[in-house]
Structures are given as structure tokens and as C-alpha cells.
């Protein structure tokens, strides 16, 4: 990839890989990052790049500084890591490389109060933060998920997010800005509660 990427993804699990391919197929330049842990997660980004057909518009990294440098300003970075301490760890490691006006998007199932805490912390650095509930699982991430967004800086990434989602029966993108703070993750929490209740009813 010869020019700066329009978005970066951190975390190449099933959701991260599906969304990376989805974004690339919509014509965006993208950088992907996965940590390197000896004997646990080795060469994940490189292996993913070796399999993709989008090497001209996608770059793979296992070092955060080079990953961040590959992104066009203001940088837009989508986190797809496990909810909880892992998100805080990634943000702590990432922020030294960021500048005012950059945007972090948490695409995992974080608790909405954690999202609000992180947003407040990042506001002191003038870094925008979005909590984005992403529904559809690995298949949806690849073919078109539904996305529920809350926080600050949505306009910086709204066109991209709306381009990768599913569409409703009227052709409208299944991507909505819910509101400030942790609103996006709050709605995703309610969504998951309804889904799991329905699954329990079917099981019974």
C-alpha cells in the first residue's frame, strides 16, 4: 500500500478479519494490526495479509507505532478486542502515538459505563471516542452488520460505517448515531439481552 490508510483496525479475530475485508471491498485503504505474543499470537497480521486479495490497498502491522504512522490524519482506529481490561490496555498503549483530533472507535461489547469513562479520559487529550455496538457476528461483519454508535466524532467516520452495513427493506443503511456518551453500547446491551432471551425461549 503506497498511500496512507483511511482507517485502521486493531484486532484480527473473526470480527476484525471480516470487517477488514468488508471495508477493503468498499474501496477504502485500510491498515490492520494484531499484537505479537510469542507462542500465542504470532504473525497474525502477516498471515492475514498473505491470504487477502487486497494487498494493494491494505497494510498489515504488528508494531503500533508503524501502524499509526500508516494512517491518514485525523486518524480513525477501530478496536475489535475483548471487552474489559483489554480495551483499556490497547488505549493506554495507543494514545502516546495519537494527536488531537484523532478518533478511536470501540467496536466490541463494552459496558456503556466503561465507554463513558474512556470517552471522558480521552476528551482531556482532545481525542474523539465512539462506542459502536456491531451486530451480526462474524458473518455479518463480512457481509454487512448493523451498527449502533454513541460518543464524539461520528461525522469523521459516518460515510465509511454506513457503506459497510446491511440495508433495510427501504435501502437505508443499518447504521445509526444513537447519541452522546455510551448510548451506542447501551442499545447494543439491550439488543443482546433480547437476543439471549429469545435463544433461551427457543431452547426451552
Residue ranges and their predicted role:
Residues 63-129:
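Rossmann-fold NAD(P) dinucleotide-binding segment
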Residues 1-75, 97, 101, 138-141:
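NAD(P)+-binding Rossmann beta1-loop-alpha1 motif at the extreme N-terminus of oxidoreductases
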Amino acid at each position: 500500500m503506497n498511500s496512507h490508510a483511511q482507517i485502521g483496525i486493531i484486532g484480527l479475530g473473526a470480527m476484525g478479519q471480516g470487517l477488514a475485508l468488508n471495508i477493503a471491498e468498499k474501496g477504502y485503504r485500510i491498515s490492520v494490526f494484531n499484537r505479537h505474543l510469542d507462542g500465542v499470537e504470532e504473525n497474525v497480521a502477516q498471515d492475514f495479509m498473505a491470504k487477502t486479495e487486497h494487498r494493494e490497498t491494505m497494510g498489515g502491522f504488528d508494531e503500533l507505532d508503524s501502524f499509526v504512522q500508516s494512517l491518514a490524519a485525523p486518524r480513525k482506529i477501530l478496536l475489535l478486542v475483548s471487552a474489559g481490561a483489554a480495551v483499556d490496555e490497547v488505549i493506554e498503549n495507543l494514545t502516546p502515538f495519537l494527536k488531537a483530533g484523532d478518533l478511536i472507535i470501540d467496536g466490541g461489547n463494552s459496558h456503556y459505563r466503561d465507554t463513558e469513562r474512556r470517552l471522558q479520559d480521552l476528551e482531556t487529550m482532545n481525542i474523539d471516542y465512539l462506542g459502536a455496538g456491531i451486530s451480526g457476528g462474524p458473518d455479518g461483519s463480512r457481509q454487512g452488520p448493523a451498527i449502533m454508535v454513541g460518543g464524539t466524532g461520528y461525522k469523521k467516520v459516518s460515510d465509511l460505517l454506513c457503506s459497510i452495513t446491511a440495508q433495510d427493506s427501504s435501502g437505508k443503511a443499518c447504521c445509526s448515531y444513537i447519541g452522546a456518551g455510551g448510548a451506542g453500547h447501551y442499545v447494543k446491551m439491550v439488543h443482546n439481552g433480547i437476543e439471549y432471551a429469545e435463544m433461551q425461549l427457543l431452547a426451552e
